[in-house]
């Protein structure tokens, strides 16, 4: 089996960019992966284009070999763009291997650990009202846990006001809780 094509598809249908990797083989098996980062998705797409000639003609079942080849081929070996691109390729290769063996990928990774996974809905907005409305919309679709990025008040022209960020966090959390009620879990992402 050999890789015959590596493509990507960028969509913003859900409001945020999502970049998908498609790897095709001469055996008719197609693998799909996700290479999404929310900033600079075109940079990831460009890196996937750069990796394409190195992957075509290779055996997609040699996942570790191809991961190492992709990593070592790149001049810039670290960071989110490289990580996203290689991750998308890696997922697509695992998808191909699972399909070619007739087993789900989780069987290749050690077997079934649970029968279901709880999802959360991410919400965003610049105001408490926007956050609350977005949270209500997610709950109306059956989501039982809401996640949002906390402490993100900043003005690129000003020094970060930590107290303003804490005050906004309290305001956003209260607005979301009021919008979704007591039975929906709230998760606060505290990165970056």
Where in this protein do the model-derived segments appear?
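Metal-dependent enolase-superfamily TIM-barrel catalytic cores that perform enediolate-based chemistry
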Residues: 116-192
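Glycine-rich, aromatic-flanked loop segments that form ligand/cofactor-binding clefts
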Residues: 90-126, 130
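General structural feature for long, well-ordered alpha-helical segments within catalytic domains
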Residues: 47, 62, 66, 85, ...
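Anionic group-transfer/hydrolysis microenvironments
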Residues: 7, 36, 92, 149, ...
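Structured beta-strand/loop patches that form or line metal/cofactor-binding pockets in enzymes
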Residues: 1-32, 36
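Short Gly/Pro-enriched turn/cap motifs at secondary-structure boundaries
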Residues: 9-12, 81, 85, 140
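Metal- or metallocofactor-binding catalytic centers and their adjacent structured scaffolds
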Residues: 26-101
